[in-house]
C-alpha cells in the first residue's frame, strides 16, 4: 500500500537534500521539483515547501529515508499540489543552482510554511531549507 500520507505527515524533513541527490543519478531524464504541498494528519492545514523527482509519469520521493515511487497524478492529488506553484529543473539546471548557491534548495521559492494558525514547536523544521552541499559533491557537479 502506498504510504504517501506518512511522507506528508513527517515533522522533520530532508526532502531537498534527498531529491537533490536523487536527480544527480538521473542526468539524462527526470526533473527535480520544488513545490508546495498540503500536509496531512498532524500537519493538516499546513502548506510547506517540499522536493521530489519526476521521471515520466512517476514521482520519486526519497525523503525521510523512504524510497517511494508513486504515480504523479496520485501524488499531486494527495498533496493537493498546484503545478503553477512548482519549480521544475532539468539535471543541468539543478546542478547549476547547486553549484551557484551551495545548498540543496529551495532556490527560487521560499519553501516556507504557509498557514493561518501557528505551527506547533515540534513541527518547526518541516522541509529543512538551505542545507549546505558537501564540497566533494559540488566538485562532482562541476566536472
Residue ranges and their predicted role:
Residues 1-7:
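Enriched but not universal
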Residues 7-143:
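A structural boundary/capping signal
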Amino acid at each position: 500500500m502506498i504510504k504517501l500520507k506518512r511522507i506528508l505527515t513527517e515533522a522533520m524533513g530532508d526532502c531537498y537534500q534527498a531529491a537533490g541527490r536523487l536527480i544527480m543519478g538521473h542526468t539524462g531524464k527526470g526533473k527535480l521539483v520544488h513545490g508546495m504541498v498540503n500536509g496531512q494528519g498532524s500537519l493538516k492545514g499546513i502548506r510547506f515547501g517540499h522536493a521530489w523527482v519526476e521521471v515520466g509519469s512517476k514521482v520519486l520521493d526519497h525523503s525521510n529515508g523512504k524510497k517511494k515511487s508513486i504515480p504523479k497524478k496520485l501524488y499531486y492529488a494527495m498533496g493537493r499540489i498546484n503545478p503553477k506553484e512548482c519549480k521544475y529543473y532539468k539535471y543541468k539546471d539543478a546542478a547549476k543552482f547547486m553549484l551557484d548557491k551551495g545548498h540543496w534548495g529551495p532556490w527560487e521559492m521560499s519553501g516556507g510554511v504557509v498557514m493561518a494558525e501557528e505551527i506547533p514547536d515540534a513541527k518547526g523544521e518541516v522541509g529543512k531549507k538551505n542545507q549546505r552541499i558537501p564540497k566533494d559533491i559540488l566538485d562532482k557537479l562541476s566536472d
